[in-house]
From Swiss-Prot:
Catalytic activity field: [3Fe-4S](1+)-[protein] + Fe(2+)-[Dph3] = [3Fe-4S](0)-[protein] + Fe(3+)-[Dph3]; 2 [3Fe-4S](0)-[protein] + 2 Fe(2+)-[Dph3] + NADH = 2 [4Fe-4S](1+)-[protein] + 2 [Dph3] + NAD(+) + H(+)
Function: Required for the first step of diphthamide biosynthesis, a post-translational modification of histidine which occurs in elongation factor 2. DPH1 and DPH2 transfer a 3-amino-3-carboxypropyl (ACP) group from S-adenosyl-L-methionine (SAM) to a histidine residue, the reaction is assisted by a reduction system comprising KTI11/DPH3 and a NADH-dependent reductase, predominantly CBR1. Acts as an electron donor to reduce the Fe-S cluster in DPH1-DPH2 keeping the [4Fe-4S] clusters in the active and reduced state.
Any matching Pfam family: Zn_ribbon_CSL
This protein's name: Diphthamide biosynthesis protein 3
Free-text comment on this protein's domains from its UniProt entry: The DPH-type metal-binding (MB) domain can also bind zinc. However, iron is the physiological binding partner as zinc binding impairs the protein electron donor function.
Record-listed Fe cation binding positions: 25, 27, 47, 50
Cellular component annotations (GO), alphabetically ordered: cytosol; nucleus
Co-factor(s): Fe(2+)
Length: 82
């Protein structure tokens, strides 16, 4: 599978209402991926208007702050308890 680019999670925009990360696509639309898909290990964001895809670079524990921002609990624990 060929990806258009690799993008750090910090460079994406997170919408707590839709729980989607987005990033501008060259076609004018936006790549998108849901936080729950990322929690399940998915790292490919797709553009709904064209065939381009990007790889999102992140660590699983990075997602906790975005779940907190959305006011929801992750479907699985993101940080090992001590």
């Amino acid at each position: 599978m060929s990806v258009y680019d690799e993008v750090e999670i910090e460079d994406m925009t997170f919408d707590p209402d839709t729980q989607l990360f987005t990033y501008p696509c060259p076609c004018g639309d936006r790549f998108q991926i849901s936080i729950d898909d990322m929690c399940d290990g998915e790292d490919i964001a797709v553009c709904p208007s064209c065939s381009l895809m990007i790889k999102v670079v992140y660590e699983l524990h990075d997602l906790q702050e975005y779940y907190d921002e959305a006011g929801v609990e992750p479907p699985v624990p993101l940080v090992a308890s001590a």
